[in-house]
């Protein structure tokens, strides 16, 4: 069964909601420079790919990508191609999207975050959502950058300084 929101017809939408048991996952990332060799969309491309692949194992609805992550730099100094919005705008947009997701029958919403810079405002967002009455719940899952057993192996072989190198690039290469 197709699990991606944008790829399903309106007629088949209720069946997706049933098959997903009311669970919808929002892949989240950002658009920013990732060194000289990775694409600007590395975070969101990885989160989106992982989310879709996981939905093939355990059915849930995959919402369209939320690409507007926080890039905490001076707007005038952002590298070419980077996109960032004020956190207040991101929070309002995400809250409205959650309302629409719930209106469509998905009462369990998971934000699968692929960008560490989103963590501070997502914590505030969750607190805000929890303090309002809703007929849905929202939680955040952060994309792990390195499998724990792999991290331990790297530390044993190369020292703890090598661990920061095992991150987005490795996931991009696996994909």
Predicted regions and their residues:
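Active-site and ligand/interface coordination hotspots across diverse enzymes
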Residues: 1-39
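Fold-independent oxyanion-binding glycine-rich loops
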Residues: 28, 65-66, 143
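Short glycine-enriched loops at secondary-structure junctions
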Residues: 60, 64-69
């Amino acid at each position: 069964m197709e699990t991606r929101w944008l790829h399903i017809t309106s007629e088949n939408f209720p069946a997706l909601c049933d098959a997903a048991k009311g669970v919808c996952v929002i892949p989240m990332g950002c658009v920013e420079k990732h060194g000289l060799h990775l694409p600007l969309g590395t975070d969101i491309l990885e989160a989106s790919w992982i989310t879709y692949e996981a939905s093939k194992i355990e059915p849930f609805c995959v919402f369209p990508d939320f690409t507007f992550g926080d890039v905490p730099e001076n707007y005038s100094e952002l590298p070419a191609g980077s996109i960032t919005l004020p956190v207040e705008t991101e929070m309002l947009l995400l809250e409205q999207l959650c309302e629409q997701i719930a209106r469509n029958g998905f009462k369990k919403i998971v934000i699968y975050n692929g960008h560490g810079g989103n963590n501070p405002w997502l914590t505030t967002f969750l607190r805000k959502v929890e303090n309002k009455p809703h007929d849905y719940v929202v939680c955040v899952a952060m994309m792990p950058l390195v499998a724990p057993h792999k991290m331990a192996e790297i530390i044993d072989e190369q020292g703890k300084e090598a661990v920061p190198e095992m991150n987005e690039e490795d996931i991009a290469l696996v994909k």
